[in-house]
């Protein structure tokens, strides 16, 4: 299922040397700075390595975050701010704002920006894995797991770490509530797509599939509405993707709800539900075409070309024809003018974000070593402090090569 998911670009960043000449006045302090520089560069390389696994990325990110916390957590036995928190300047782009970077001299800004990229990597890993030919059950579980991990990272950043920033996020930037909320909800919705595909593959109860599809459609609608007040120039393409997914899963919900109604001998209502499914599916097809033509940040998904998308159209058509035949021979029910309300609540299969925790502080960052960082000796960046509007070269991400579509998203 290559090109099933829309993905915004990774955040780009300027190099950071951590050369605290004069301030780092001991070999142990200098080693922390050198290790920070090396760990950061290694982690950034992981983001663009198509062979990188979740375990490898976690090991690399844990190494960096364990060291970086030595610039954030109090290490002098008091509750006062870490004296190193504001000593180094960091520059990051945003996923919707092109190559113009934001700059803050704050280690917490670095923490949330890098962790944001880690979450983005998990969504991209899930997308690549879902695009494999003949994906296995274990790989499907990895897709599901990765999307929940991403949602958990975004959620923890929003609730715990972003509020600590001295300088609040500007409108339209990744760290402001509307943008990060959308990433949280989209990751959850896509994880539930895995569950739906699995439920269909195993021929689970139609009512369960309908409820899951309805909940997933509502997630996509919520994500779309969250972006309503964002600048259309940077958000319209993303919104169109969320809208097409919403209508696609509403079509699923009405289709499988129709099957449930037919099984309960409510043939007239089943027909009306299937007609509504046809309407939602047609709208999803139109939105797919509009999405493909839109310009904006991110890769362009091609859901309408996938067998998973096309199969739903055939299922709706065949089920509706079956209902109409049964109604003509057996039930003779009147078809209601209004579609049956989808008052569905999924009891199983809902994707909750996986809790995200930072690794423990590195053993290198002791109070004794911390005391050898001497701010009175002054510090100047080895380059002039960044201007907020400085352009940074975008991240060159690995190409997503199309593979033969088996018609099964993740199962």
Curated annotation (Swiss-Prot):
Q: What is the annotated localization of this protein?
A: Membrane
Give the BRO1 domain ranges.
84-403
Q: Which domain of life is it from?
A: Eukaryota
Q: Mark out the compositionally biased spans (Basic and acidic residues).
A: 379-404
Q: Which region ranges are annotated with the description Disordered?
A: 379-411
- Which residues get removed as pro-piece? 409-411
Q: Give the residue numbers of the S-farnesyl cysteine lipid attachment.
A: 408
Q: Which family does it belong to?
A: Belongs to the BROX family.
Give the protein's recorded name. BRO1 domain-containing protein BROX
Task: Supply the gene name.
Answer: brox
């Amino acid at each position: 299922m290559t090109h099933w998911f829309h993905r915004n670009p990774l955040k780009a960043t300027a190099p950071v040397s951590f050369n605290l000449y004069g301030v780092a006045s001991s070999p142990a302090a200098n080693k922390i700075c050198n290790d920070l520089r090396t760990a950061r560069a290694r982690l950034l390389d992981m983001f663009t390595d198509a062979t990188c696994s979740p375990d490898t990325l976690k090991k690399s990110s844990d190494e960096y975050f364990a060291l970086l916390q030595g610039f954030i957590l109090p290490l002098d036995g008091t509750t006062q701010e870490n004296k190193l928190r504001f000593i180094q300047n960091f520059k990051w782009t945003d996923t919707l704002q092109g190559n113009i970077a934001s700059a803050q001299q704050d280690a917490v800004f670095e923490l949330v920006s890098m962790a944001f990229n880690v979450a983005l990597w998990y969504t991209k890993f899930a997308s690549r894995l879902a695009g494999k030919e003949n994906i296995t059950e274990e790989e499907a579980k990895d897709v599901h797991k990765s999307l929940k991990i991403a949602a958990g990272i975004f959620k923890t950043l929003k609730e715990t770490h972003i509020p600590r920033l001295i300088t609040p996020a500007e409108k339209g930037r990744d760290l402001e509530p509307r943008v990060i909320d959308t990433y949280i909800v989209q990751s959850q919705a896509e994880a539930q797509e895995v569950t739906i595909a699995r439920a269909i593959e195993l021929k689970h109860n139609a009512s369960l599939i309908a409820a899951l599809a309805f909940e997933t459609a509502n997630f996509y609608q919520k994500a779309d509405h969250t972006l309503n007040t964002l600048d259309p120039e940077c958000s319209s393409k993303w919104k169109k993707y969320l809208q097409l997914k919403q209508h696609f899963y509403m079509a699923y919900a009405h289709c499988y709800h129709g099957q449930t109604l037919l099984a309960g001998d409510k043939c007239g209502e089943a027909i009306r539900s299937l007609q509504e499914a046809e309407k939602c599916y047609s709208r999803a097809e139109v939105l797919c075409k509009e999405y493909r033509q839109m310009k904006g940040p991110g890769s362009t998904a091609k859901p309408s070309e996938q067998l998973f998308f096309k199969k739903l159209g055939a299922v709706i058509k065949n089920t509706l024809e079956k209902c109409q035949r049964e109604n003509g021979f057996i039930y003779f029910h009147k078809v209601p003018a209004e579609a049956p309300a989808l008052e569905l609540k999924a009891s199983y299969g809902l994707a909750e974000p996986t809790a995200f925790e930072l690794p423990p502080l590195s053993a290198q960052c002791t109070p004794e070593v911390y005391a050898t960082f001497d701010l009175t000796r002054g510090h100047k960046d080895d380059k002039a402090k960044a201007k907020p509007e400085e352009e940074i070269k975008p991240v060159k991400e690995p190409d997503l090569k199309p593979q033969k579509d088996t018609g099964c998203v993740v199962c």
